[in-house]
Design a protein with these regions (language model features):
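Sec-dependent bacterial lipoprotein signal peptides
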Residues: 1-29
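Sequence signature of WD/YWTD-type beta-propeller architectures
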Residues: 2-3, 29-170
């Protein structure tokens, strides 16, 4: 008989009071503040400049540098370690924007080389770089991969207007 009485006592609590109690209990358990990844942030702080981050699954691509020499960097978040990108960074090119796919295999890069902007696709496993033509001609500014890495969206300046081109990648 004690169980029915306990149920009856709960039945006497107004629904709004029960809802308030539930919110207070759950609110105390949830921490909705962002937490910095201290180890990774300290590692990134060793570079004088870090900009244009692109985050995808377990990968962080960014442009970083010292003493005016910027280059694309790739970090595997689960290991907190940089990944080499042989053949991607050129001393005579200035990186503008970067994106990385969810597997860390493909990186898209906008860079300035000899006074012009170009879009290139880097395949990490092949250490290969492929120029992606912008048609009709324009100046690429920003980019983003689709979730599966097969499609690339590129913001392109044409005639003073910003447009978005969506490219299916080979």
């Amino acid at each position: 008989m004690s169980r029915p009485r306990q149920l009856q006592r709960w039945a006497l609590v107004p629904a709004s009071g029960l809802g308030l109690a539930l919110c207070l209990l759950l609110g105390g358990c949830l921490d909705n503040r962002a937490r910095p990844l201290l180890g990774l942030n300290l590692q990134l702080a060793h570079t004088a400049v870090n900009r244009d981050p692109a985050l995808s699954s377990d990968w962080l691509a960014l442009i970083g540098g010292r003493e005016g020499r910027e280059q694309v960097r790739l970090v595997r978040l689960s290991q907190g370690a940089p990944v080499p990108l042989p053949g991607l960074n050129r001393p005579d090119a200035r990186p503008v924007a970067v994106a990385v796919d969810g597997w860390g295999e493909r990186l898209a890069l906008i860079r300035e080389l000899e006074g012009r902007s170009e879009l290139v696709l880097y395949r990490r496993s092949l250490q290969s770089l492929q120029l992606i033509p912008i048609e009709p001609a324009g100046v690429p500014h920003r980019l983003a991969f689709s979730a599966d890495g097969r499609v690339l969206a590129v913001e392109v300046g044409r005639g003073g207007l910003s447009q978005v081109d969506v490219l299916e990648l080979p």
